[in-house]
Amino acid sequence: MNLYVLGSSSSGNCYLLYNERSILIIEAGVPFKELNKLHLFNLKKVSGCIITHEHGDHASRVKEYQDKGIKCYASSGTISKLNENVKNISLFNSEDFEVFHFPVDHDASDPVGFYIKSGEETILFATDTYVLRYNFKELTSILIECNYSMDILNENLKNGKLSASRRDRTIL
């Protein structure tokens, strides 16, 4: 199983897990044209797109992906916020990827992380969360997407809520 990162930031998130037969898209936060530019991308191989939560940097391109024939999947709470014909993540079915979702803590409606299995490989994917409440065993890869705000860090430093060394560790 291979990984290609198209975007991991506040302006858009999108990751491709792929093998010789299939592509699994994680997050719908970058334009489809960016996917289509990739030499490894083949629309016929796409198993689907799984989405962690409804925030724009993760889900703003759902309709665009669906218009290209890509089935998108998310949790019930996320589906209720998207106003698109997104399928429940529990319905995702692929010959090459087994996807299990689990709840994470974030300011969204029903955000989830993913435990993905393909052959002998397992990947843990978690984004925009400050804690993972489960223990995962026998992982071959861990993908954690996280951001920070320099303004908030500096404000917390100024107010004594954060030490300078901790702020510096965050930004390095």
Question: Model-flagged regions — what are they?
Answer:
Residues 1-6, 92-105, 164-172:
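Glycine-rich phosphate-binding "P-loop"
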Residues 11-14, 54-55, 99-102:
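Structured catalytic core of nucleotide-sugar glycosyltransferases
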Residues 31-77:
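Active-site metal-binding motif and surrounding structural segment of the metallo-beta-lactamase
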Residues 136-172:
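Cap/insert and terminal regions of metallo-dependent hydrolase folds
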Residues 1-39, 112-128, 141:
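Conserved beta-strand hairpin/beta-sheet module of binuclear metal-dependent hydrolase folds
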Residues 62-65, 79-85, 94, 133-138:
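Short loop/helix-cap segments at secondary-structure boundaries that form the rim of catalytic
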Residues 92-149:
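Catalytic core of the metallo-beta-lactamase
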Residues 24-27, 48-51, 69-76, 82, ...:
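Short, hydrophobic beta-strand segments that form beta-sheet elements in well-ordered domains
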